[in-house]
């Protein structure tokens, strides 16, 4: 890990601790997916809030690799953890909303993310905790998250870190190799991977946003499209002009 990244991490940890204290929260909660991003956030919270942290593994058709990865994380990092079975409410919602998960993959997948969000915030309210997001800079920049799903959080610690930074931090925090080596995925449906959906690798995107790589015309168009079409995800809800003199 570079000295610059280590200094950033130290500042981030001090800022996060102070933010939680100033919010008068008792601790933090993190959704644990088995991916490297959530692993790094979980490891950081274990360090900063050893007693007052909670990680949730929320089961909705989770893969065997998801199970192995989250189990390894909880055991190796000694995380406070709760397992939550969201399969019954997920099935009930599919039926109530007449969603066919085989024909409407993204609709059903985003429903999973929003159910997990509701679970995280319910536990946060129960314990007076803040919800920590796990998205990195690439995901936020390209809108690679579910609006009001995994994009919903109180604090986003990794928002200005590239994927390569996250991998470096995973080594620093002694994240299990199983987690580090697996292909990044949002786990919204079987076989999904981040890079296949984005159309570029994280390495390419890291280099591009640092100004070290010129993309092909096709890939540049893909990045431009993803950024433009996801702008609404990075903005507050649109409002009309005020009727009165006071502001929100």
UniProtKB/Swiss-Prot annotation:
This is NH(3)-dependent NAD(+) synthetase. Deamido-NAD(+) binds at residues 114, 147, 154, 232-233. Transmembrane segments: none annotated. GO terms for biological process: NAD biosynthetic process. InterPro entries: NAD/GMP_synthase, NAD_synthase, NH(3)-dep_NAD(+)_synth, Rossmann-like_a/b/a_fold. It comes from Mycoplasma pneumoniae (strain ATCC 29342 / M129 / Subtype 1) (Mycoplasmoides pneumoniae). The gene is nadE. It is an enzyme of class 6 (ligase). Catalyzes the ATP-dependent amidation of deamido-NAD to form NAD. Uses ammonia as a nitrogen source. ATP binds at residues 31-38, 134, 163, 185.
